Amino acid sequence: IVGGNGCGKSTLAKVMSGVLPIDKGKVSVLGHTPTSPVMARNMGIATVFQEVMVAEEASVVDNLFVGSDDFWWKNFTQREKVLKAQEIMEDLVGEYVDPYTQAFNLSLPIKAWITIARAFLRENTKVLILDESSAALDFDSTERLFKKMRELRDNGVAVFIVTHRIA
C-alpha cells in the first residue's frame, strides 16, 4: 500500500486491524470486518505500526511477551520465554541481544525489532500488516525484515506493507 503523506494508508491499516471504526464503506479481512484489536488478533491479524512501542523500564523478554496471556506461550516457563526471546531477536537482528537488558539501554533499531518481533511470535498469524515498520531500521535491518516477510508469505501469510516510498 503506497501513497503520499495523509492519503489514508495508516488509517486503512488501523481499520484492518480493528483499531479504528469504519465511518463509510466496508472493509473485509478474511471474510470479516474487525471491530476491535482483540477481534483482529483472534482472526489472525498481526499489526506492527511505525511507533516503537516498548516499556523502557522492562527487559527485552518482558517487552516481547507483554500482553501475551492468551497466546500459545502462556504456559511457557520464564526460562522458555528467555530462550524464545534470544532465538527470535538473534534471528531478526542478526546478532545476540541480551534478553535481560532493559529497553532504555537499547538503540532505537533494537527497540523497533522488539516491536516487530511481537508479531513474529504470534502462532496463528494469517495476515501481517506492517505500517511504516521499517522507519527506524537501517538498510541491512530492512533487508532482514523483508527476508522474514518473504518467508511468512511463502508459508501462506498475507503481508501488507504500508509505505510512502518504494525503495
Regions found by a protein language model. Give the residues of each.
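Glycine-rich phosphate-binding loops of nucleotide-dependent enzymes
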Residues: 1-167
